[in-house]
Amino acid sequence: MELAEFWNDLNTFTIYGPNHTDMTTKYKYSYHFPGEQVADPQYWTILFQKYWYHSITISVLYFILIKVIQKFMENRKPFTLKYPLILWNGALAAFSIIATLRFSIDPLRSLYAEGFYKTLCYSCNPTDVAAFWSFAFALSKIVELGDTMFIILRKRPLIFLHYYHHAAVLIYTVHSGAEHTAAGRFYILMNYFAHSLMYTYYTVSAMGYRLPKWVSMTVTTVQTTQMLAGVGITWMVYKVKTEYKLPCQQSVANLYLAFVIYVTFAILFIQFFVKAYIIKSSKKSKSVKNE
C-alpha cells in the first residue's frame, strides 16, 4: 500500500454514510449519571471525520512546545510544583478509575451476552454511556499532554517513549473515534485501567511517599501487557476481516495504524522495563558486591 493510498484510506469513512451497515450493539446501561451521554453522536462523529488530522497538527505543536520550553528552562532552576502535581495526577487518577468502572460494564456485558466476535467487531451504542466514556477518552488524550510540561518544568529526564506515546495515542484515538473502531472497546478499557494504576502511583509518589520497587514494576508490567494485548487484538480483527471474511467495524487502514503503534509501544516498553529494572538492578548488585 502506497503512502498516498494509505492516507486516502485513512480519510475514507463509512459511518453515517449512504451505504453504511449498522454494526453497533443496542445495549443500554440500567443507570445514567447526569450528563453521561453524547448529545448528537452523528454531529461529533462527522466533526471527527472532517478534522481528525488536526490531531497530527496538535502533536506537531506539542513537539515544538517541548523544545521551546526545554530551551527556556535550560539555564533556569527547576520548579518544584509539588501541590499542582499532586492535584494533576490525583484528578487524572480519579477520572481513570471512574471511567474504568463505568466503561467496563459495556465490553464485559457484551462478552457475556453476545460473545467475543460481536464484542470485537460491533461498536458500543453511540447514544449510551459507553459512547460518552469513549468520547471522554479521546478528549483526555489532549489533556494528558500536560504530563510532559510537568516533567520539563521540573527538569526531570524526558525519554522518547513518553512523548511518542502521548502523541501517537492522541492521533490513533481521534481517528478511531471518527470511524467508531469496535476493538476500541478493548483498547480503551485497557488504557483506562492502566492509567488508573499509573496516575494513582504518580499521585502517591508526588505526595512524597516512597513506594516499594515492585509497585512501579507492576505498573510498567501492566502497561507492557496492554501493548502486547493490543497487538493480539489487532491481529484478531485482521484475521476476522481477511481470513474469515466477516464484517468488522474497523478499517484496514486503521488496523495498519494500530499495528504500527502497538508494536512500537510494546518494543519501547519492553526496552524501558529491561533498562529500568533488570540492567539497573544488575548494576546496583555489582556495586554492592564490590563495596
From Swiss-Prot:
Topology of this chain in the membrane: Multi-pass membrane protein
Cellular localisation: Membrane
Gene Ontology terms, MF aspect: fatty acid elongase activity
Keyword check for Lipid biosynthesis: yes
Record's keyword terms, sorted: Fatty acid biosynthesis, Fatty acid metabolism, Lipid biosynthesis, Lipid metabolism, Membrane, Transferase, Transmembrane, Transmembrane helix
Reactions that this protein is recorded to catalyse: a very-long-chain acyl-CoA + malonyl-CoA + H(+) = a very-long-chain 3-oxoacyl-CoA + CO2 + CoA
Cellular component, GO, one term: endoplasmic reticulum membrane
Pathway membership, UniProt: Lipid metabolism; fatty acid biosynthesis
Main location per the UniProt record: membrane
Transmembrane residue ranges: 46-66, 79-99, 254-274
EC number annotated for this UniProt entry: 2.3.1.199
Function: Could be implicated in synthesis of very long chain fatty acids.
Name of the protein this chain belongs to: Putative fatty acid elongase 4
Species this chain originates from: Caenorhabditis elegans
